[in-house]
Amino acid sequence: MSSRADTSKEVCAIYVDMGTTNTRAWLMRGSRVIARLGSPVGVRDTARDRSPQKVHAALRELIGAFQAQIKTVSSTPASKLKSGLPVCVAAAGMIGSPLGLAEVPHLQAPVGMAEIAAAAQWVQFPEITDLPILLIPGVRSGPAAVKFDTIHTTDVMRGEETLCIGLASLGYIQPPAVVLNLGSHWKAIQLDAEGRIESSSTSLSGELVHAAQSQTILASALPEDRASVIAEPWMKAGMREQRRSGLARAAFSVRLLQLANQGAPEERLSFLIGAFVASEMDALIARRVLAEEKQVAIVGIPALAAAWRSALMAMSVPASVLSPAETEDALLTGLRCILEKCLTMKDTKARKGEKPSRR
């Protein structure tokens, strides 16, 4: 990690994390965040519009805003400001998918930072920025040939690999471990003893809970917003009902509870979340993805993280919850570590007279 005291050697760069529905960006010098911005644009816009124009425009605005901010707040002449200006953009997430800027193929697990950095690609998009852009690859697990009878071992990620590198670098996890990322999708990522990404397992649970809240007969029984707190007795009741009757029946039980005037909407949502947690956790334990000897680091929506931690601790699986600030720090650390390694490799190639890989 760069020394905080010697700022002359710290890289100033723009970091980007693009998801399905939004994009986050940070201007950093070394390990310090100078500014952060966001945009409600993601790769879903490309899929919907069948054009990357909105993604390109959002990136152009974010990068331009950072560059303008530096020039505005500094009274130093431009000729003396060179070392304080961003030298490149490093981006992870769906930006490296076919719906992003350019496709960077998934790497086959197991992989660590060395393999990820070696496969990252430098690209140029003059219509967006004159800065070089580093696209970080995602990771896939399972056999190369996907078939219906091996689909249970197949999974993909984009962005979480960078988060995992940061978590390990900062000591938030001690491999072998599992990172549980809870958002629209719930993803369990296994890290081996060397800290490499070994495999992952993703479910649609987050989206299904949201769909139940807004698109099913359960909508009137549940709050419109996502859970802000979990009513633990109701969550545990939902877990028990799922184990007794299955997920679909447990979900319909929310409607029955409403008809019987049992519980507030927020409590019934805790019941539903408990059913999904039990369904997923039991499957992961059965596959030995989760086990007593594996530390679990939980990131994502705070209420869901609290629900999962409670459920895991009840099964004697050690689990800790990372705050949103810690999660952001880990993601940015992962981005920075990968970028610094890529810049070192780029400099080495330049000294040898080789041309860096570029689209």
Regions found by a protein language model. Give the residues of each.
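Short glycine-rich, Thr/Ser-proximal phosphate-binding strand/loop in the N-terminal lobe
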Residues: 13-54, 321
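N-terminal phosphate-binding loop and adjacent alpha-helix
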Residues: 35-86, 97-99, 103, 218-221, ...
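Glycine-rich phosphate-binding loop plus the immediately following alpha-helix
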Residues: 44-48, 140-240
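Short beta-strand-loop/turn "lid" adjacent to the catalytic site in phosphate-handling enzymes
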Residues: 69-154, 193
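Short, low-complexity, charge-dense intrinsically disordered segments
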Residues: 345-359
